[in-house]
C-alpha cells in the first residue's frame, strides 16, 4: 500500500446490521447517556414506524414519534420539531426513513444543540462546532449515501460538518423497502461511484480506500441478488452507509460532478447520467493513475479474476468490468441507455455542462470534462 505524505480520516459512525438490529437501540441509547429519543419518520404509511416502536418492547425506554416529515421541510417544520423536542424532554434524535428524514434530523440536531436561529445563521455551509446530541439513523428506503455523511441539505441550503454524521446506523432487514421505481438501482450506482472515484482520486486516502473496497465488494458479490430486488436491499443499505463515510473523507470525482451538471443543463436525471458517465470517467482517470486502476480491478472482479488477468492488462480491464457491474446491478428493468446520445441528451448541451462541472473543482478541467462527456455521448469505450 502506497502511503501519502499526509492524510486524514474521521468517522464516528458505528453500524449495527442484521436480524433484530433494532433491538440494540435501547442499549446504544444508554451508552450515549440518552433516555428519550425523538423519532422522525417520513409521511409513508408502510408499517415501519410500528415495527420500530415494537422493537423497544419492554426496554422501558420511552420514544416520541413524529410521523410526516414532508418531502421538502422548511424552517417552520424545524421550529415545530424543536418545540416538540424541548417540550417532551427529548435528548436524542433518530431518523427513520431516507434522505429527507436524515437531513431534517441533522438540521434539528444543530437547532436543539443551540437555537433554531443557529441553523439559519450558519455561514459558509458549516454549522457552529457545538457538541451535538446523539443522532441515530435507521434506513427504510434506498438513499444516496449522504445520510451517513457529513453533509446535509435543508431549506435549500447545504451544510457540512463532521459532527453531522450519525453516531449509529442501524440496518435491520425488517425495515427495508425498495421505494420508488428505479430508486434501488440509483442508490447502488451512487454508492459505487463514490467508492470508485475515491479509489481513483489524485490524493488517495488509504483508509477511505479500505472502506471503498468493501462498498464495491458488497455490490459486486450481490449483483446477482440485485435481479431479485428484495434480496439486494440489505447489501445496498450496508454499501450506502459505508459510502457516506467514504464521501465524508474524499472529494467528489468528475463523474459525480458531471452528472450533477448535466442534469442541471438537460432533462436527464442525475442517476441516469451517473450510470452512463461513470465507466467513461473511470477510464479517463485510469490513464492518469494506471496503478490505482489496476488495483481497482480486485474489488470489482474478485480475487480469482484479478489473479488470472496479467498485471499489464489490469488497468485496461477495469472500466469494462465496471460497466458490466453497473448493468448487472441495474438489471433489465432499470438498465441505463448505452450512451448520453441514446438518452436523448442534446450534444450542444455538453460544453455548458463541462463548464458548470469545472467551476466546482472536480479535478478535471473544462476541456477534460468535455472529453469525458463526448465519449459518453457517443458511447465510445
Q: Could you describe each region identified by the protein language model?
A:
Residues 1-92:
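ATP/NTP phosphate-donor binding region
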Residues 76-174:
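Glycine/threonine-rich beta-strand-loop-alpha-helix active-site module
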Residues 151-250:
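Carboxylate- and glycine-rich phosphate/diphosphate-binding segment that chelates Mg2+/Mn2+
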Residues 250-323:
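C-terminal catalytic subdomain
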Residues 300-381:
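C-terminal charged capping/lid subdomain of soluble metabolic enzymes
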Amino acid at each position: 500500500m502506497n502511503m501519502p505524505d499526509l492524510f486524514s480520516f474521521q468517522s464516528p459512525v458505528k453500524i449495527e446490521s442484521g436480524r433484530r438490529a433494532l433491538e440494540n437501540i435501547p442499549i446504544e441509547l444508554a451508552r450515549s447517556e440518552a433516555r428519550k429519543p425523538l423519532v422522525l419518520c417520513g409521511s409513508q404509511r408502510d408499517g415501519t414506524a410500528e415495527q420500530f416502536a415494537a422493537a423497544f418492547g419492554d426496554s422501558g425506554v420511552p420514544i416520541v414519534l413524529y410521523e410526516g416529515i414532508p418531502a421538502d421541510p422548511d424552517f417552520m417544520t424545524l421550529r415545530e420539531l424543536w418545540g416538540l423536542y424541548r417540550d417532551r424532554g427529548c435528548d436524542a434524535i433518530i431518523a427513520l426513513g431516507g434522505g429527507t428524514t436524515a437531513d431534517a434530523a441533522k438540521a434539528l440536531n444543530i437547532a436543539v444543540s443551540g437555537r433554531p436561529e443557529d441553523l439559519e445563521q450558519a455561514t459558509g455551509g458549516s454549522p457552529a462546532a457545538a457538541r451535538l446530541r446523539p443522532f441515530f439513523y435507521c434506513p427504510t428506503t434506498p438513499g444516496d449515501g449522504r445520510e451517513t455523511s457529513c453533509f446535509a441539505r435543508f431549506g435549500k441550503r447545504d451544510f457540512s460538518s463532521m459532527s453531522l454524521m450519525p453516531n449509529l446506523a442501524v440496518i435491520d432487514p425488517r425495515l427495508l423497502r425498495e421505494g420508488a421505481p428505479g430508486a434501488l438501482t440509483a442508490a447502488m450506482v451512487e454508492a459505487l461511484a463514490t467508492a470508485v472515484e475515491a479509489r481513483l482520486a489524485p490524493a488517495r486516502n488509504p483508509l477511505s480506500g479500505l472502506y471503498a473496497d468493501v462498498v464495491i465488494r458488497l455490490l459486486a458479490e450481490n449483483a446477482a441478488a440485485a435481479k431479485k430486488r428484495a434480496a439486494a436491499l440489505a447489501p445496498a443499505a450496508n454499501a450506502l452507509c459505508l459510502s457516506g463515510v467514504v464521501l465524508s473523507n474524499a472529494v467528489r470525482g468528475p463523474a459525480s460532478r458531471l452528472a450533477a451538471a448535466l442534469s442541471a443543463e438537460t432533462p436527464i436525471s442525475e442517476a441516469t447520467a451517473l450510470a452512463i458517465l461513470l465507466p467513461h470517467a473511470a477510464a479517463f482517470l485510469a490513464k492518469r493513475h494506471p496503478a490505482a486502476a489496476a488495483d481497482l480491478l480486485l474489488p470489482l472482479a474478485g480475487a480469482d479474476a484479478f489473479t488470472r488477468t496479467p498485471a499489464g492488462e489490469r488497468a485496461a480491464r477495469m472500466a469494462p468490468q465496471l460497466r458490466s457491474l453497473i448493468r448487472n446491478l441495474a438489471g433489465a428493468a432499470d438498465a441505463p441507455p448505452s450512451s448520453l446520445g441514446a438518452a436523448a441528451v442534446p450534444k450542444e448541451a455538453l460544453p455548458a455542462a463541462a463548464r458548470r462541472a469545472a467551476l466546482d473543482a472536480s479535478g478535471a478541467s473544462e476541456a477534460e470534462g468535455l472529453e469525458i462527456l463526448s465519449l459518453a455521448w457517443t458511447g465510445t469505450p
